[in-house]
C-alpha cells in the first residue's frame, strides 16, 4: 500500500532550448534572380545591396567594396524556440532542478535530502544535506536545489532522490524517488589499424549521431609511454605560415566585428548593411570541424615506437586512446575519452627479411644479400633454410645455403647469402624460406626383456608387402597434396624483393 507523505518532491531537468534550423539550397551568384531577391529582402527587413528603382542591380549588390564576392551562407534560424527533448549524450553536463515542498498543513522537522546518480558500474553522490538539515519546515515552505554532473557512462542512468524528515508526532519517515534517463553516444567511432614494421597507422572515422550539429574542436591521440604519435590528417598538412596568417586575419575580423554598430533608419531597418556584410566573414580554424547530423569525418594518426629495439613496444597490444572535444550549436562543451585502442600482433615466432641489397646488380655476376632473422618468441628456435624452387626464376642461389645456429629468445641473427642473376630487367628475389625444426631430444636406449628376445620374428607374405606399399604410396600422395594446399605452421617464407638487373657490358652488340 502506497504511503502518503507530508512532503512533495519534484525534479526537472535544466536544458537549453533547441533552435530549429533550415538547410537552404545554395546556388551560384549568377543564377540569383535579383528582382525577386530584392523583394524578399525588403520583406525580411534586410538588404544585401542597393537596388535602383528600375529593379536592376548595381555592381555592389553581391560584391563588396574591395571587389571580392560575398559568400551567402544560409543560417535559416527561425524565431520560435522549441523545448529540447529529454535526450542527453555521453560527455555532456547533466543538470537538474529539485524542489522539495511541504504541501501539508503540518510542520515537519529535520528535513534533509540525498541525491545520487547510479550507473551500471558506480554510484556517484551529488547532494547530501544531512549535515545542514532544515530544523523546521513550515506548511507551504519549499527548498530548491540544483545539481549537475558530467555524464561519463552510456546506457540507463538513474537519479535517486532520498528525503528524510520527522513528523509532528516525532516519527522519522523517508521516501525515495527514481528518475531514469537514457544516455546516448553522440559520436559513432570506427577505428582501423594498419600495422607495419616499426610504424602503426590509426584511422579514426567520427560520425555525428546527435539530432543537431556538432563542432569538433579537437581530437587527440594519447599514446602509452612506449610510443609517439603524430596527427597526419589532410587539413594538418598546411604550412605554419599559412596557419599564422589565417589566425591573424581571424583576430582582425573579430576586432572589426566588435567595433561595428547597427544604424537604423526611421522605419527601423538597418542602413549600413553593405558595411556589415563586408566585415562579417565566416572565420574557421583548421582544427575545428563542423559536422551536420549523420555526417562523418576521418582522421589519421602515425604511431611510432620510441625505441625500435624495445621488446615491450614490439609486443605491446594497447597503443593509447583518443581524446575528443566538441561543442553543440549552443556552445555546450562535451568531452569523450575512449578505452584503450588495441592492435592485433603478428603471432609468428620468427620474422624473416632481406636487407643490404645492392643498388646495382650486374647480369651473371654474383652478389650478396643479408638474411635477417628475428626470434619474437620466448624460446630457443632451430631454423633451417629452405628453397621454393618453383618460384625462383630470374635470380637463384649461387651456392649452398649456410647452416643456421639456434636463435636465442628475443634476439636477431644476420646471415650472408650469395645470389646469382640469370635474367636482365626487373626481377624478384623470391623463393627463400625458413623452416623451424623441433628441438633436439636426448636419445634413450630401449631395453628389451628376455621373453621378447626369444619370440621368433614372423616374416610378412608377398600380399601383405604389396598392400603396405600401396597404402604408403597413398599416404605420401595425400601428404604432398596437403603441403601444396597449405604450408605447415613452422614454414616462413621471405617477402619478395624487386630489384633491377643490368647488363654486364655497357655496350650491347646486335646479333
Curated annotation (Swiss-Prot):
Lineage: superkingdom: Eukaryota
Annotated GO CC locations: TRAPPIII protein complex
Signal peptide feature range: none
PANTHER family: TRAFFICKING PROTEIN PARTICLE COMPLEX SUBUNIT 13 (PTHR13134:SF3)
Family stated for the protein in its record: Belongs to the TRAPPC13 family.
Name the UniProt record assigns to this protein: Trafficking protein particle complex subunit 13 homolog
Organism annotation: Dictyostelium discoideum
Amino acid at each position: 500500500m502506497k504511503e502518503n507523505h507530508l512532503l512533495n518532491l519534484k525534479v526537472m531537468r535544466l536544458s537549453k532550448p533547441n533552435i530549429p534550423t533550415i538547410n537552404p539550397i545554395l546556388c551560384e551568384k549568377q543564377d540569383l534572380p535579383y528582382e525577386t531577391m530584392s523583394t524578399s529582402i525588403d520583406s525580411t527587413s534586410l538588404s544585401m545591396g542597393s537596388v535602383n528603382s528600375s529593379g536592376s542591380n548595381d555592381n555592389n549588390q553581391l560584391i563588396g567594396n574591395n571587389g571580392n564576392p560575398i559568400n551567402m551562407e544560409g543560417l535559416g534560424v527561425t524565431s520560435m524556440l522549441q523545448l529540447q527533448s529529454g535526450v542527453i549524450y555521453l560527455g555532456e553536463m547533466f543538470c537538474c532542478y529539485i524542489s522539495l515542498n511541504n504541501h501539508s498543513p503540518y510542520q515537519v522537522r529535520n528535513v534533509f535530502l540525498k541525491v545520487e546518480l547510479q550507473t551500471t558500474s558506480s554510484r556517484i553522490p551529488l547532494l547530501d544535506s544531512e549535515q545542514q538539515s532544515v530544523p523546521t519546515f513550515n506548511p507551504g515552505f519549499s527548498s530548491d536545489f540544483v545539481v549537475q554532473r558530467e555524464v561519463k557512462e552510456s546506457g540507463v542512468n538513474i537519479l535517486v532522490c532520498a528525503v528524510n524528515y520527522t513528523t509532528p508526532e516525532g516519527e522519522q519517515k523517508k521516501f525515495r524517488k527514481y528518475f531514469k534517463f537514457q544516455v546516448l553516444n553522440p559520436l559513432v567511432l570506427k577505428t582501423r589499424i594498419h600495422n607495419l614494421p616499426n610504424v602503426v597507422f590509426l584511422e579514426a572515422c567520427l560520425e555525428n549521431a546527435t539530432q543537431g550539429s556538432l563542432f569538433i574542436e579537437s581530437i587527440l591521440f594519447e599514446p602509452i609511454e612506449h610510443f609517439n604519435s603524430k596527427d597526419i590528417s589532410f587539413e594538418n598538412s598546411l604550412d605554419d605560415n599559412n596557419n599564422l596568417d589565417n589566425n591573424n586575419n581571424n583576430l582582425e575580423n573579430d576586432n572589426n566585428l566588435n567595433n561595428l554598430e547597427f544604424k537604423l533608419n526611421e522605419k527601423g531597418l538597418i542602413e549600413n548593411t553593405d558595411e556589415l556584410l563586408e566585415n562579417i566573414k565566416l572565420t574557421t580554424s583548421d582544427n575545428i570541424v563542423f559536422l551536420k547530423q549523420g555526417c562523418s569525418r576521418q582522421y589519421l594518426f602515425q604511431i611510432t615506437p620510441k625505441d625500435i629495439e624495445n621488446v615491450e613496444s614490439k609486443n605491446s597490444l594497447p597503443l593509447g586512446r583518443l581524446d575528443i572535444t566538441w561543442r553543440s550549436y549552443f556552445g555546450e562543451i562535451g568531452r569523450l575519452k575512449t578505452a584503450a585502442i588495441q592492435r592485433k600482433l603478428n603471432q609468428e615466432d620468427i620474422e624473416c627479411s632481406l636487407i643490404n641489397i645492392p643498388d646495382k646488380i650486374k647480369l651473371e655476376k654474383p652478389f650478396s644479400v643479408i638474411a635477417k632473422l628475428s626470434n619474437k618468441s620466448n624460446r630457443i628456435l632451430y631454423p633451417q633454410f629452405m628453397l621454393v624452387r618453383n618460384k625462383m626464376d630470374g635470380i637463384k642461389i649461387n651456392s649452398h645455403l649456410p647452416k643456421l645456429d639456434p636463435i636465442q629468445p628475443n634476439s636477431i641473427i644476420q646471415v650472408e647469402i650469395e645470389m646469382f642473376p640469370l635474367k636482365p630487367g626487373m626481377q624478384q628475389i623470391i623463393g627463400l624460406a625458413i623452416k623451424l625444426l623441433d628441438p633436439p631430444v636426448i636419445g634413450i636406449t630401449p631395453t628389451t626383456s628376455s621373453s621378447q628376445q626369444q619370440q621368433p620374428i614372423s616374416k610378412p607374405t608377398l600380399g601383405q608387402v604389396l598392400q603396405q606399399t600401396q597404402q604408403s604410396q597413398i599416404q605420401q600422395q595425400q601428404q604432398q597434396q596437403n603441403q601444396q594446399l597449405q604450408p605447415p605452421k613452422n614454414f616462413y617464407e621471405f617477402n619478395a624483393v624487386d630489384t633491377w638487373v643490368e647488363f654486364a657490358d655497357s655496350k650491347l652488340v646486335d646479333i
